[in-house]
């Protein structure tokens, strides 16, 4: 089976042969630098990696594509089926994280004047003199 792929298609599936690595990296570097590269490779120490035609781009269609659409589709179905049975890492449920503190809505009109606040609740509202920070950062104080 032969796999004919132009550089424009390589990014979509991520595959290329070792013979074309130099070309792919050159094209990708040109794209990254927003530079249009000529097809002719200048003489350099690495020219042998661009053999046999010593040009940057491979002409499209020089290898006949013998893969039918149904064959490619069946491979895709088989891959997706195999992926379904691969164990994966457990995921964390996405949910909104509440803030570190909670400020309840306090409406004096809704408070019952006949209900008293117990001593324990009042003690929780007192801020100690040796408390330097509002949160868990008080470990930093000495």
Curated annotation (Swiss-Prot):
MF GO annotations: histone deacetylase activity, hydrolytic mechanism
Region Disordered, residue ranges: 99-142
Gene3D superfamilies: Histone deacetylase domain (3.40.800.20)
Positions with biased composition (Basic and acidic residues): 113-130
UniProt enzyme class: hydrolase
Sequence segments annotated as region (Histone deacetylase): 14-34
Single biological process term from Gene Ontology: chromatin organization
Top-level division of the source organism's lineage: Eukaryota
A GO cellular component annotation in the UniProt record: nucleus
EC number in record: 3.5.1.98
Main subcellular location of this protein, as a coarse class: nucleus
Catalytic activity: N(6)-acetyl-L-lysyl-[histone] + H2O = L-lysyl-[histone] + acetate
Sorted UniProt keywords: Chromatin regulator, Hydrolase, Nucleus, Repressor, Transcription, Transcription regulation
Subcellular localization(s) per the UniProt record: Nucleus
Compositional bias segments (type: Acidic residues): 131-142
InterPro entries documented for this protein: His_deacetylse_dom_sf, Ureohydrolase_dom_sf
Functional note: Responsible for the deacetylation of lysine residues on the N-terminal part of the core histones (H2A, H2B, H3 and H4). Histone deacetylation gives a tag for epigenetic repression and plays an important role in transcriptional regulation, cell cycle progression and developmental events. Histone deacetylases act via the formation of large multiprotein complexes.
Family: Belongs to the histone deacetylase family.
Name recorded for this polypeptide: Putative histone deacetylase 10
